């Protein structure tokens, strides 16, 4: 999934309603570089922030899918992925992210009759 600008409404939903920090690719790269140089605060900021791909995913879902329940499920799956993959350095992160997020959305759809 390629990064595209996140719609203001989606950014507001993620940041205000869900308390998620949305980073642009440039912001993410800067924090990765600072973390790699030993900046502990940058590392902690990366842990608190979520990735542009999550915003893209939610942005491309139908509006009635933008629920706290689905977002919580996606965040939980994202945390599982980041325990295994370093998104700053691992080229396979995008493929794993895409596969796992599709699975999480599919499970949610089945459970909610969508």
What are the language-model segments listed below?
Residues 2-114:
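Alpha-helical promoter-recognition and RNA polymerase-docking modules of transcription initiation factors
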